[in-house]
Protein backbone atom coordinates (compact mmCIF):
# COMPACT_ATOMS: atom_id res chain seq x y z
CA UNK A 1 0.00 0.00 0.00
CA UNK A 2 1.32 3.41 -0.92
CA UNK A 3 0.53 6.81 0.53
CA UNK A 4 0.75 10.01 -1.47
CA UNK A 5 1.33 12.83 1.01
CA UNK A 6 0.72 16.28 -0.43
CA UNK A 7 1.51 19.72 0.96
CA UNK A 8 -0.82 22.34 -0.51
CA UNK A 9 0.77 25.78 -0.92
CA UNK A 10 -1.64 28.65 -0.13
CA UNK A 11 -2.47 30.94 -3.03
CA UNK A 12 -0.90 34.41 -3.18
CA UNK A 13 -3.08 37.47 -3.66
CA UNK A 14 -2.70 38.91 -7.16
CA UNK A 15 -1.09 42.36 -7.40
CA UNK A 16 -0.98 44.88 -10.22
CA UNK A 17 1.68 43.95 -12.77
CA UNK A 18 4.00 46.66 -14.06
CA UNK A 19 4.73 47.02 -17.80
CA UNK A 20 7.29 44.63 -19.21
CA UNK A 21 10.70 46.31 -19.66
CA UNK A 22 12.93 45.66 -22.63
CA UNK A 23 15.40 42.84 -22.07
CA UNK A 24 18.87 42.65 -23.57
CA UNK A 25 19.08 38.91 -24.23
CA UNK A 26 22.56 39.21 -25.78
CA UNK A 27 24.24 40.01 -22.48
CA UNK A 28 26.30 37.31 -20.80
CA UNK A 29 27.34 37.05 -17.19
CA UNK A 30 31.09 37.36 -16.59
CA UNK A 31 32.65 36.77 -13.20
CA UNK A 32 36.02 37.76 -11.75
CA UNK A 33 38.30 34.98 -10.63
CA UNK A 34 37.46 35.71 -6.98
CA UNK A 35 33.85 36.57 -6.17
CA UNK A 36 32.66 38.29 -2.98
CA UNK A 37 30.11 36.28 -1.01
CA UNK A 38 27.23 38.60 -1.90
CA UNK A 39 28.10 38.42 -5.62
CA UNK A 40 28.30 34.64 -5.44
CA UNK A 41 24.92 34.49 -3.71
CA UNK A 42 23.46 36.76 -6.37
CA UNK A 43 24.83 34.57 -9.14
CA UNK A 44 23.39 31.47 -7.51
CA UNK A 45 20.01 33.14 -7.14
CA UNK A 46 20.02 34.19 -10.78
CA UNK A 47 20.90 30.67 -11.87
CA UNK A 48 18.13 29.25 -9.67
CA UNK A 49 15.62 31.74 -11.11
CA UNK A 50 16.67 30.83 -14.64
CA UNK A 51 16.14 27.15 -13.91
CA UNK A 52 12.73 27.97 -12.44
CA UNK A 53 11.78 29.99 -15.52
CA UNK A 54 12.68 27.03 -17.73
CA UNK A 55 10.52 24.70 -15.65
CA UNK A 56 7.53 27.08 -15.78
CA UNK A 57 7.94 27.38 -19.55
CA UNK A 58 8.02 23.61 -19.80
CA UNK A 59 4.71 23.36 -17.95
CA UNK A 60 3.03 25.94 -20.17
CA UNK A 61 4.44 24.40 -23.35
CA UNK A 62 3.14 20.96 -22.41
CA UNK A 63 -0.38 22.25 -23.15
CA UNK A 64 0.43 23.45 -26.65
CA UNK A 65 -0.76 22.02 -29.94
CA UNK A 66 2.20 21.29 -32.20
CA UNK A 67 1.34 21.29 -35.88
CA UNK A 68 3.69 20.32 -38.71
CA UNK A 69 5.01 23.90 -38.97
CA UNK A 70 5.43 24.47 -35.23
CA UNK A 71 7.97 27.22 -34.46
CA UNK A 72 7.63 27.32 -30.69
CA UNK A 73 11.24 26.47 -29.87
CA UNK A 74 12.74 28.95 -32.34
CA UNK A 75 10.34 31.91 -32.17
CA UNK A 76 7.89 31.84 -29.28
CA UNK A 77 9.92 30.25 -26.49
CA UNK A 78 12.52 33.07 -26.24
CA UNK A 79 9.69 35.62 -25.86
CA UNK A 80 7.96 33.39 -23.31
CA UNK A 81 11.16 33.07 -21.27
CA UNK A 82 11.62 36.86 -21.20
CA UNK A 83 8.06 37.34 -19.92
CA UNK A 84 8.49 34.63 -17.29
CA UNK A 85 11.81 36.15 -16.15
CA UNK A 86 9.97 39.36 -15.37
CA UNK A 87 7.23 37.61 -13.39
CA UNK A 88 9.78 35.58 -11.40
CA UNK A 89 12.02 38.60 -10.75
CA UNK A 90 9.02 40.46 -9.28
CA UNK A 91 7.58 37.35 -7.59
CA UNK A 92 4.30 37.99 -9.41
CA UNK A 93 1.80 35.33 -10.51
CA UNK A 94 2.21 34.23 -14.11
CA UNK A 95 -0.57 35.96 -16.06
CA UNK A 96 -1.98 33.98 -19.02
CA UNK A 97 -4.81 35.31 -21.21
CA UNK A 98 -7.01 33.49 -23.71
CA UNK A 99 -10.00 34.85 -25.68
CA UNK A 100 -12.44 31.93 -25.75
CA UNK A 101 -15.81 30.48 -24.69
CA UNK A 102 -18.13 32.59 -26.90
CA UNK A 103 -21.42 30.62 -26.88
CA UNK A 104 -22.74 27.21 -27.88
CA UNK A 105 -23.04 26.34 -31.55
CA UNK A 106 -26.49 27.19 -32.94
CA UNK A 107 -26.64 23.69 -34.48
CA UNK A 108 -28.37 21.92 -31.58
CA UNK A 109 -29.50 18.98 -33.71
CA UNK A 110 -26.11 17.73 -34.85
CA UNK A 111 -23.33 19.34 -32.77
CA UNK A 112 -24.20 20.24 -29.16
CA UNK A 113 -26.63 19.23 -26.42
CA UNK A 114 -28.08 22.71 -25.91
CA UNK A 115 -27.28 26.39 -25.29
CA UNK A 116 -25.80 25.94 -21.81
CA UNK A 117 -22.31 24.83 -20.71
CA UNK A 118 -22.00 21.08 -20.18
CA UNK A 119 -19.36 18.62 -18.98
CA UNK A 120 -17.19 19.56 -21.96
CA UNK A 121 -16.87 23.12 -20.63
CA UNK A 122 -16.26 21.78 -17.14
CA UNK A 123 -13.39 19.54 -18.22
CA UNK A 124 -11.77 22.27 -20.31
CA UNK A 125 -12.01 24.79 -17.45
CA UNK A 126 -10.40 22.26 -15.11
CA UNK A 127 -7.71 21.78 -17.74
CA UNK A 128 -6.93 25.51 -17.87
CA UNK A 129 -7.02 25.65 -14.07
CA UNK A 130 -4.42 22.88 -13.89
CA UNK A 131 -1.91 25.13 -15.69
CA UNK A 132 -1.89 27.56 -12.78
CA UNK A 133 -2.02 24.73 -10.23
CA UNK A 134 1.03 23.03 -11.72
CA UNK A 135 2.94 26.31 -11.83
CA UNK A 136 2.13 26.95 -8.17
CA UNK A 137 3.64 23.59 -7.22
CA UNK A 138 7.09 24.88 -8.20
CA UNK A 139 6.52 28.65 -7.92
CA UNK A 140 4.46 29.81 -4.88
CA UNK A 141 2.91 32.92 -6.53
CA UNK A 142 1.37 30.48 -9.00
CA UNK A 143 -0.34 31.43 -12.19
CA UNK A 144 -3.80 32.10 -13.52
CA UNK A 145 -5.59 31.98 -16.85
CA UNK A 146 -7.83 34.95 -17.61
CA UNK A 147 -10.61 33.92 -19.99
CA UNK A 148 -11.87 36.87 -22.02
CA UNK A 149 -15.26 35.97 -23.45
CA UNK A 150 -15.41 36.93 -27.12
CA UNK A 151 -19.02 35.92 -27.76
CA UNK A 152 -20.19 39.47 -28.40
CA UNK A 153 -17.82 39.71 -31.38
CA UNK A 154 -19.50 37.01 -33.41
CA UNK A 155 -22.95 36.09 -32.09
CA UNK A 156 -24.98 38.22 -34.52
CA UNK A 157 -23.08 36.68 -37.45
CA UNK A 158 -24.31 33.22 -36.39
CA UNK A 159 -27.84 34.15 -35.33
CA UNK A 160 -27.20 33.78 -31.58
CA UNK A 161 -28.94 36.31 -29.30
CA UNK A 162 -27.15 38.61 -26.86
CA UNK A 163 -29.20 37.08 -24.05
CA UNK A 164 -27.90 33.61 -24.88
CA UNK A 165 -24.30 34.87 -24.84
CA UNK A 166 -24.87 36.34 -21.37
CA UNK A 167 -26.46 33.13 -20.00
CA UNK A 168 -23.62 30.99 -21.37
CA UNK A 169 -21.02 33.18 -19.63
CA UNK A 170 -22.97 33.05 -16.38
CA UNK A 171 -22.96 29.25 -16.60
CA UNK A 172 -19.18 29.25 -16.89
CA UNK A 173 -18.88 31.45 -13.80
CA UNK A 174 -21.05 29.02 -11.83
CA UNK A 175 -18.86 26.06 -12.79
CA UNK A 176 -15.68 27.85 -11.70
CA UNK A 177 -17.28 29.02 -8.44
CA UNK A 178 -18.73 25.63 -7.49
CA UNK A 179 -15.55 23.72 -8.28
CA UNK A 180 -13.31 26.32 -6.62
CA UNK A 181 -11.06 26.72 -9.66
CA UNK A 182 -8.86 29.40 -8.11
CA UNK A 183 -6.49 29.66 -11.08
CA UNK A 184 -9.20 30.91 -13.48
CA UNK A 185 -10.34 34.50 -13.88
CA UNK A 186 -12.93 36.00 -16.23
CA UNK A 187 -13.08 39.22 -18.17
CA UNK A 188 -15.16 40.67 -21.01
CA UNK A 189 -15.24 43.82 -23.21
CA UNK A 190 -17.24 45.78 -20.63
CA UNK A 191 -14.54 45.06 -18.05
CA UNK A 192 -11.69 45.93 -20.43
CA UNK A 193 -13.25 49.12 -21.85
CA UNK A 194 -15.41 50.59 -19.09
CA UNK A 195 -13.93 48.98 -15.97
CA UNK A 196 -15.15 46.23 -13.67
CA UNK A 197 -17.44 48.62 -11.79
CA UNK A 198 -19.52 49.10 -14.95
CA UNK A 199 -20.03 45.46 -16.01
CA UNK A 200 -23.72 44.55 -16.55
CA UNK A 201 -25.08 42.30 -13.82
CA UNK A 202 -28.38 41.27 -15.41
CA UNK A 203 -29.32 39.76 -18.74
CA UNK A 204 -31.56 42.71 -19.55
CA UNK A 205 -28.85 45.28 -18.83
CA UNK A 206 -26.33 43.36 -20.91
CA UNK A 207 -28.67 43.12 -23.91
CA UNK A 208 -29.51 46.83 -23.75
CA UNK A 209 -25.86 48.00 -23.65
CA UNK A 210 -23.86 45.50 -25.70
CA UNK A 211 -24.74 46.98 -29.11
CA UNK A 212 -23.24 50.37 -28.32
CA UNK A 213 -20.13 48.79 -26.81
CA UNK A 214 -19.60 46.59 -29.89
CA UNK A 215 -19.80 49.64 -32.15
CA UNK A 216 -17.15 51.38 -30.06
CA UNK A 217 -14.94 48.27 -29.98
CA UNK A 218 -14.91 47.67 -33.72
CA UNK A 219 -14.55 51.38 -34.52
CA UNK A 220 -11.78 52.17 -32.04
CA UNK A 221 -9.63 49.03 -32.10
CA UNK A 222 -9.73 47.97 -35.74
CA UNK A 223 -6.14 48.20 -37.09
CA UNK A 224 -5.58 51.13 -39.46
CA UNK A 225 -4.95 50.10 -43.04
CA UNK A 226 -5.78 46.45 -42.39
CA UNK A 227 -6.05 44.43 -45.62
CA UNK A 228 -7.57 40.97 -45.15
CA UNK A 229 -6.48 39.56 -48.51
CA UNK A 230 -2.90 40.74 -48.01
CA UNK A 231 -2.72 39.17 -44.56
CA UNK A 232 -4.22 35.94 -45.84
CA UNK A 233 -1.54 35.69 -48.53
CA UNK A 234 1.38 36.49 -46.22
CA UNK A 235 0.46 35.11 -42.78
CA UNK A 236 0.07 31.30 -42.51
CA UNK A 237 -1.63 31.70 -39.13
CA UNK A 238 -4.34 33.90 -40.65
CA UNK A 239 -4.89 31.26 -43.33
CA UNK A 240 -5.20 28.55 -40.67
CA UNK A 241 -7.75 30.60 -38.73
CA UNK A 242 -9.71 31.39 -41.90
CA UNK A 243 -9.91 27.72 -42.88
CA UNK A 244 -10.85 26.77 -39.34
CA UNK A 245 -13.70 29.30 -39.27
CA UNK A 246 -15.08 28.04 -42.59
CA UNK A 247 -14.86 24.48 -41.31
CA UNK A 248 -16.93 25.33 -38.23
CA UNK A 249 -19.38 27.56 -40.08
CA UNK A 250 -20.28 24.80 -42.54
CA UNK A 251 -21.63 22.75 -39.63
CA UNK A 252 -22.70 25.55 -37.25
CA UNK A 253 -25.01 27.04 -39.88
CA UNK A 254 -26.13 23.74 -41.44
CA UNK A 255 -29.73 24.18 -40.30
CA UNK A 256 -29.75 27.77 -41.59
CA UNK A 257 -28.57 26.57 -45.01
CA UNK A 258 -31.08 23.72 -45.04
CA UNK A 259 -34.04 25.95 -44.22
CA UNK A 260 -33.14 28.29 -47.08
CA UNK A 261 -32.30 25.45 -49.48
CA UNK A 262 -29.02 27.13 -50.40
CA UNK A 263 -26.78 25.70 -53.11
CA UNK A 264 -23.23 24.52 -52.41
CA UNK A 265 -21.76 27.59 -54.07
CA UNK A 266 -24.04 29.90 -52.07
CA UNK A 267 -23.06 28.11 -48.85
CA UNK A 268 -19.33 28.46 -49.60
CA UNK A 269 -19.75 32.15 -50.42
CA UNK A 270 -21.76 32.80 -47.24
CA UNK A 271 -19.22 30.98 -45.04
CA UNK A 272 -16.35 32.90 -46.64
CA UNK A 273 -18.08 36.23 -46.04
CA UNK A 274 -18.85 35.42 -42.40
CA UNK A 275 -15.32 34.07 -41.79
CA UNK A 276 -13.81 37.30 -43.14
CA UNK A 277 -16.01 39.35 -40.81
CA UNK A 278 -15.05 37.15 -37.86
CA UNK A 279 -11.34 37.61 -38.53
CA UNK A 280 -11.67 41.39 -38.91
CA UNK A 281 -13.64 41.62 -35.66
CA UNK A 282 -11.16 39.30 -33.99
CA UNK A 283 -8.34 41.68 -34.91
CA UNK A 284 -10.08 44.48 -33.02
CA UNK A 285 -10.77 42.22 -30.06
CA UNK A 286 -7.14 41.04 -29.90
CA UNK A 287 -5.98 44.67 -29.96
CA UNK A 288 -8.28 45.41 -27.02
CA UNK A 289 -6.92 42.44 -25.05
CA UNK A 290 -3.31 43.44 -25.78
CA UNK A 291 -3.90 47.03 -24.67
CA UNK A 292 -5.78 46.06 -21.50
CA UNK A 293 -3.21 43.45 -20.45
CA UNK A 294 0.20 44.43 -21.86
CA UNK A 295 2.13 41.87 -19.84
CA UNK A 296 0.80 38.35 -20.24
CA UNK A 297 1.37 34.98 -21.84
CA UNK A 298 -1.02 34.99 -24.79
CA UNK A 299 -2.79 31.69 -25.33
CA UNK A 300 -5.02 30.81 -28.27
CA UNK A 301 -7.61 28.14 -29.01
CA UNK A 302 -6.99 28.52 -32.75
CA UNK A 303 -4.45 26.62 -34.81
CA UNK A 304 -1.15 28.42 -35.41
CA UNK A 305 2.58 27.85 -35.82
CA UNK A 306 3.15 29.15 -32.27
CA UNK A 307 5.00 32.33 -33.16
CA UNK A 308 2.94 35.25 -31.84
CA UNK A 309 0.82 33.25 -29.40
CA UNK A 310 0.63 29.72 -28.05
CA UNK A 311 -2.07 27.40 -29.39
CA UNK A 312 -3.30 25.14 -26.59
CA UNK A 313 -5.47 22.04 -26.30
CA UNK A 314 -8.70 22.28 -24.31
CA UNK A 315 -8.61 18.70 -23.03
CA UNK A 316 -5.67 16.83 -21.51
CA UNK A 317 -5.73 13.52 -23.33
CA UNK A 318 -5.49 14.53 -26.99
CA UNK A 319 -3.81 17.22 -29.04
CA UNK A 320 -6.48 16.80 -31.75
CA UNK A 321 -4.07 17.22 -34.66
CA UNK A 322 -3.81 20.74 -36.08
CA UNK A 323 -7.23 22.06 -35.09
CA UNK A 324 -8.21 22.27 -31.41
CA UNK A 325 -11.57 20.72 -30.56
CA UNK A 326 -13.68 23.12 -28.49
CA UNK A 327 -16.53 22.21 -26.11
CA UNK A 328 -18.82 24.93 -27.48
CA UNK A 329 -18.76 23.25 -30.92
CA UNK A 330 -19.11 19.64 -29.73
CA UNK A 331 -20.80 17.12 -27.45
CA UNK A 332 -19.04 15.43 -24.50
CA UNK A 333 -19.51 11.67 -24.23
CA UNK A 334 -18.14 8.48 -22.71
CA UNK A 335 -17.67 5.64 -25.16
CA UNK A 336 -16.19 2.14 -25.15
CA UNK A 337 -12.70 2.94 -26.42
CA UNK A 338 -11.47 6.33 -25.19
CA UNK A 339 -9.60 6.50 -21.89
CA UNK A 340 -11.30 9.78 -21.02
CA UNK A 341 -14.13 12.06 -22.03
CA UNK A 342 -14.40 12.59 -25.79
CA UNK A 343 -15.59 15.64 -27.71
CA UNK A 344 -17.10 15.49 -31.17
CA UNK A 345 -20.33 16.07 -33.03
CA UNK A 346 -23.26 14.24 -31.44
CA UNK A 347 -22.39 10.52 -31.60
CA UNK A 348 -25.99 9.54 -32.38
CA UNK A 349 -25.71 8.28 -35.94
CA UNK A 350 -23.64 5.16 -35.29
CA UNK A 351 -24.55 1.69 -34.08
CA UNK A 352 -23.81 2.46 -30.40
CA UNK A 353 -26.78 3.91 -28.47
CA UNK A 354 -26.22 6.74 -25.98
CA UNK A 355 -28.18 8.04 -23.02
CA UNK A 356 -28.23 11.53 -21.55
CA UNK A 357 -26.51 11.81 -18.14
CA UNK A 358 -25.48 14.60 -15.79
CA UNK A 359 -22.76 15.15 -13.21
CA UNK A 360 -23.10 16.42 -9.65
CA UNK A 361 -23.35 20.00 -10.92
CA UNK A 362 -26.24 19.11 -13.21
CA UNK A 363 -24.06 19.43 -16.34
CA UNK A 364 -24.99 17.12 -19.19
CA UNK A 365 -23.01 14.56 -21.20
CA UNK A 366 -23.75 11.38 -23.14
CA UNK A 367 -22.83 7.88 -22.01
CA UNK A 368 -22.73 4.79 -24.22
CA UNK A 369 -25.70 2.58 -23.32
CA UNK A 370 -23.82 -0.71 -23.55
CA UNK A 371 -23.27 -3.64 -21.12
CA UNK A 372 -19.89 -2.44 -19.81
CA UNK A 373 -21.62 0.62 -18.27
CA UNK A 374 -24.37 -1.51 -16.73
CA UNK A 375 -22.26 -2.52 -13.75
CA UNK A 376 -25.36 -3.35 -11.69
CA UNK A 377 -27.91 -5.40 -13.56
CA UNK A 378 -30.10 -7.55 -11.33
CA UNK A 379 -33.68 -8.56 -12.24
CA UNK A 380 -34.72 -8.49 -8.58
CA UNK A 381 -33.41 -4.92 -8.03
CA UNK A 382 -34.22 -2.96 -11.22
CA UNK A 383 -34.57 0.32 -9.31
CA UNK A 384 -31.02 0.03 -7.96
CA UNK A 385 -29.57 -0.22 -11.46
CA UNK A 386 -31.43 2.93 -12.48
CA UNK A 387 -29.82 4.91 -9.62
CA UNK A 388 -26.21 4.28 -10.67
CA UNK A 389 -24.61 7.56 -11.79
CA UNK A 390 -21.47 7.94 -13.92
CA UNK A 391 -19.35 11.08 -13.72
CA UNK A 392 -16.17 11.64 -15.77
CA UNK A 393 -13.24 12.98 -13.76
CA UNK A 394 -10.50 15.39 -14.78
CA UNK A 395 -8.02 14.57 -16.19
CA UNK A 396 -8.94 10.89 -16.40
CA UNK A 397 -10.95 8.29 -14.61
CA UNK A 398 -14.57 7.79 -13.67
CA UNK A 399 -16.67 8.22 -10.54
CA UNK A 400 -19.57 5.80 -10.07
CA UNK A 401 -22.11 6.84 -7.44
CA UNK A 402 -24.54 4.29 -6.04
CA UNK A 403 -27.15 4.58 -3.26
CA UNK A 404 -25.41 4.65 0.11
CA UNK A 405 -24.90 1.23 1.64
CA UNK A 406 -25.04 -0.67 -1.65
CA UNK A 407 -23.34 -4.08 -1.16
CA UNK A 408 -20.37 -4.56 -3.45
CA UNK A 409 -21.71 -8.02 -4.16
CA UNK A 410 -24.45 -6.42 -6.28
CA UNK A 411 -21.90 -5.40 -8.91
CA UNK A 412 -21.16 -7.39 -12.04
CA UNK A 413 -17.44 -7.63 -11.35
CA UNK A 414 -16.58 -8.73 -14.89
CA UNK A 415 -18.16 -5.51 -16.21
CA UNK A 416 -16.33 -3.42 -13.61
CA UNK A 417 -13.08 -4.97 -14.84
CA UNK A 418 -14.03 -4.31 -18.48
CA UNK A 419 -14.84 -0.68 -17.66
CA UNK A 420 -11.55 -0.25 -15.79
CA UNK A 421 -9.68 -1.21 -18.96
CA UNK A 422 -11.08 1.98 -20.51
CA UNK A 423 -11.49 4.33 -17.54
CA UNK A 424 -8.86 3.96 -14.85
CA UNK A 425 -9.02 4.64 -11.99
CA UNK A 426 -12.69 4.14 -11.18
CA UNK A 427 -13.85 5.58 -7.87
CA UNK A 428 -17.00 4.12 -6.32
CA UNK A 429 -19.06 6.13 -3.85
CA UNK A 430 -21.79 4.77 -1.62
CA UNK A 431 -20.69 1.17 -1.12
CA UNK A 432 -21.15 -0.67 2.16
CA UNK A 433 -17.49 -1.17 3.21
CA UNK A 434 -18.33 -4.09 5.49
CA UNK A 435 -19.47 -6.11 2.48
CA UNK A 436 -15.98 -6.26 1.00
CA UNK A 437 -14.76 -9.78 1.80
CA UNK A 438 -11.86 -11.97 0.79
CA UNK A 439 -14.25 -13.97 -1.37
CA UNK A 440 -15.21 -10.86 -3.36
CA UNK A 441 -11.54 -9.93 -3.70
CA UNK A 442 -10.80 -13.41 -5.04
CA UNK A 443 -13.72 -13.14 -7.47
CA UNK A 444 -12.44 -9.80 -8.75
CA UNK A 445 -8.91 -11.12 -9.24
CA UNK A 446 -10.35 -14.12 -11.05
CA UNK A 447 -12.32 -12.05 -13.57
CA UNK A 448 -9.89 -9.11 -13.80
CA UNK A 449 -6.47 -10.68 -13.62
CA UNK A 450 -3.39 -9.71 -11.64
CA UNK A 451 -2.84 -6.36 -13.32
CA UNK A 452 -5.93 -4.84 -11.69
CA UNK A 453 -6.62 -3.98 -8.09
CA UNK A 454 -9.64 -3.13 -6.00
CA UNK A 455 -9.21 -1.29 -2.70
CA UNK A 456 -11.86 -0.13 -0.27
CA UNK A 457 -11.63 2.07 2.81
CA UNK A 458 -13.21 1.31 6.16
CA UNK A 459 -13.16 4.00 8.86
CA UNK A 460 -9.42 4.63 9.09
CA UNK A 461 -8.48 1.22 7.68
CA UNK A 462 -7.50 0.49 4.10
CA UNK A 463 -8.62 -3.02 3.22
CA UNK A 464 -7.20 -5.02 0.34
CA UNK A 465 -7.42 -8.68 -0.51
CA UNK A 466 -5.01 -9.86 2.18
CA UNK A 467 -4.16 -6.93 4.44
CA UNK A 468 -5.78 -4.38 6.71
CA UNK A 469 -3.47 -1.69 8.07
CA UNK A 470 -4.37 1.23 10.25
CA UNK A 471 -3.82 4.62 8.63
CA UNK A 472 -1.86 7.12 10.67
CA UNK A 473 -3.57 10.49 11.17
CA UNK A 474 -6.77 11.47 9.41
CA UNK A 475 -7.97 8.94 6.88
CA UNK A 476 -9.89 11.63 5.00
CA UNK A 477 -6.65 13.50 4.33
CA UNK A 478 -4.76 10.44 3.12
CA UNK A 479 -4.14 9.50 -0.50
CA UNK A 480 -3.20 5.94 -1.27
CA UNK A 481 -3.39 3.23 -3.86
CA UNK A 482 -3.37 -0.55 -3.87
CA UNK A 483 -0.23 -2.18 -5.28
CA UNK A 484 -0.92 -4.91 -7.82
CA UNK A 485 -0.28 -8.55 -7.04
CA UNK A 486 3.20 -8.37 -8.58
CA UNK A 487 6.11 -8.15 -6.15
CA UNK A 488 9.71 -7.07 -6.27
CA UNK A 489 10.95 -5.32 -9.39
CA UNK A 490 7.69 -5.98 -11.26
CA UNK A 491 5.44 -4.15 -8.82
CA UNK A 492 6.69 -0.58 -8.81
CA UNK A 493 7.03 0.01 -12.60
CA UNK A 494 3.40 -0.99 -13.09
CA UNK A 495 2.32 1.86 -10.82
CA UNK A 496 4.76 4.57 -11.82
CA UNK A 497 2.58 6.17 -14.55
CA UNK A 498 -0.35 6.46 -12.16
CA UNK A 499 1.68 7.74 -9.23
CA UNK A 500 3.57 10.25 -11.36
CA UNK A 501 0.43 11.68 -12.93
CA UNK A 502 -1.44 11.72 -9.63
CA UNK A 503 1.33 13.59 -7.86
CA UNK A 504 1.72 16.14 -10.63
CA UNK A 505 -1.68 17.82 -10.72
CA UNK A 506 -3.43 19.59 -7.89
CA UNK A 507 -6.80 18.71 -9.42
CA UNK A 508 -5.93 15.02 -9.52
CA UNK A 509 -5.35 14.95 -5.79
CA UNK A 510 -8.75 16.37 -5.07
CA UNK A 511 -10.88 14.86 -7.81
CA UNK A 512 -9.30 11.60 -8.95
CA UNK A 513 -7.70 10.17 -5.84
CA UNK A 514 -10.39 12.07 -3.93
CA UNK A 515 -10.67 12.38 -0.15
CA UNK A 516 -11.47 8.77 0.56
CA UNK A 517 -14.27 8.10 3.02
CA UNK A 518 -15.95 4.98 4.32
CA UNK A 519 -17.69 3.28 1.44
CA UNK A 520 -15.34 4.52 -1.29
CA UNK A 521 -13.45 2.05 -3.44
CA UNK A 522 -10.91 2.39 -6.23
CA UNK A 523 -10.43 0.03 -9.15
CA UNK A 524 -7.26 0.51 -11.21
CA UNK A 525 -5.89 -1.19 -14.29
CA UNK A 526 -2.14 -0.64 -14.08
CA UNK A 527 -1.66 -1.45 -17.77
CA UNK A 528 -3.60 1.63 -18.89
CA UNK A 529 -1.37 4.35 -20.34
CA UNK A 530 -2.77 7.38 -18.59
CA UNK A 531 -3.77 10.34 -20.77
CA UNK A 532 -1.68 13.04 -19.14
CA UNK A 533 0.78 14.96 -21.29
CA UNK A 534 3.31 15.65 -18.55
CA UNK A 535 7.01 15.60 -19.25
CA UNK A 536 9.07 13.61 -16.72
CA UNK A 537 11.05 16.59 -15.44
CA UNK A 538 7.83 18.35 -14.37
CA UNK A 539 6.66 15.51 -12.13
CA UNK A 540 7.00 15.62 -8.38
CA UNK A 541 6.22 12.19 -6.97
CA UNK A 542 5.84 12.04 -3.21
CA UNK A 543 5.01 8.69 -1.72
CA UNK A 544 5.70 6.63 1.37
CA UNK A 545 4.63 3.37 2.93
CA UNK A 546 1.33 3.10 4.74
UniProtKB/Swiss-Prot annotation:
<dbReference type="GO" id="GO:0016491">
    <property type="term" value="F:oxidoreductase activity"/>
</dbReference>
<comment type="function">
    <text>Isocyanide synthase involved in the biosynthesis of isocyanides (or isonitriles), a class of microbial secondary metabolites. The presence of an isonitrile moiety within a compound imparts unique biological (cytotoxic, antibacterial, and antiprotozoal) and chemical (transition metal coordination) properties and enables synthetic and biochemical applications.</text>
</comment>
<keyword id="KW-0560">Oxidoreductase</keyword>
<dbReference type="InterPro" id="IPR007817">
    <property type="entry name" value="Isocyanide_synthase_DIT1"/>
</dbReference>
<comment type="similarity">
    <text>Belongs to the isocyanide synthase family.</text>
</comment>
<protein>
    <recommendedName>
        <fullName>Isocyanide synthase B</fullName>
        <ecNumber>1.-.-.-</ecNumber>
    </recommendedName>
</protein>
<dbReference type="Pfam" id="PF05141">
    <property type="entry name" value="DIT1_PvcA"/>
</dbReference>
Amino acid sequence: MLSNTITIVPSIETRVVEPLPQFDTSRRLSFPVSLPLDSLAGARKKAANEALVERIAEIIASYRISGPDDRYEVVYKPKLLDTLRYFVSKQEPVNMVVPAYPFKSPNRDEKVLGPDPDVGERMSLEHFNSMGARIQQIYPPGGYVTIVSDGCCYNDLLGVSDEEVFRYAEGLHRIVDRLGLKHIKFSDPFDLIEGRHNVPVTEEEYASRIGELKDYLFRSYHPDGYDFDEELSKDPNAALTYRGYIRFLMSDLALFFKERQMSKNAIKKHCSTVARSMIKRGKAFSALVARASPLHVRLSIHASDNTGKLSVALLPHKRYSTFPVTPWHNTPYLDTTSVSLSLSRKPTDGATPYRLCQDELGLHFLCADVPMYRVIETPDLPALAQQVQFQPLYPFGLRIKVPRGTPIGQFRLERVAELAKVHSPIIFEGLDPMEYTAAIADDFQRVAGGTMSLSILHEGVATTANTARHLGGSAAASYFLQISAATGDDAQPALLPFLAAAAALDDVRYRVLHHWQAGHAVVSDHRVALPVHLSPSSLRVLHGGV
